[in-house]
Amino acid sequence: MFLSKRRIVLFGVIGALVITIIFLPRIQYFVNAPDVNVIDFNLAAVNISNISNNTNKIELSLLFDVYNPSDKSATTSKVEYDLFGDNKLLGRGVLSYEDIPLNGRPQFSPGQTATLKSAIILQPSDMNMDVIEKLISNSSDSINSIRWNVNGSSQIESAFVILEKDFSDVL
């Protein structure tokens, strides 16, 4: 007989395991998903790291403060952003932690602020040449006179869930 009591139990257990494996991410989503809308990305600082007068290339260092007011921990695998200076697109940046294990990525602990540092190299173009010239001419004073803003998105991860968070900030 093909369907003995043992085989029926075996097929039932295998079926339950398969259903659990398939639906586990959905269950975790509803149980452990943090509200990514409350996680706050702020552009904390823009500093000049290096100026190359020969090529007019400028390397900037950006600091993002990430505040997590929720009661669940989270982390990020990638932050993509567009940097604007005086409402002119200066460049696109990517801060990636995708090749780093979860325990080595920046942790957004409940009620805490984490700081992320990113470098971006500005390439001169007709659109942004006045901002680059302003930075080259007097780097210490001019960086404070420029209106910096950033628009971007981040992949927020918690347990088995990856959610997209859009952000925008002005400095």
Locations of the language-model features?
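Short edge-strand/loop segments of extracellular domains
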Residues: 80-88
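Membrane engagement elements in two modes
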Residues: 1-54, 126, 155, 159-171
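Asparagine-centered strand-capping/turn motif at beta-strand->loop junctions
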Residues: 50-52, 64-70
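Short, hydrophobic/aromatic beta-strand segments
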Residues: 72-80, 92-94
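Short, solvent-exposed loop/turn segments enriched in Ser/Thr/Gly
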Residues: 56-63
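Terminal connector regions
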Residues: 122-171
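Intrinsically disordered, low-complexity Pro/Gly/Ser/Thr-rich segments with frequent PxxP/GP/PP motifs
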Residues: 87-130
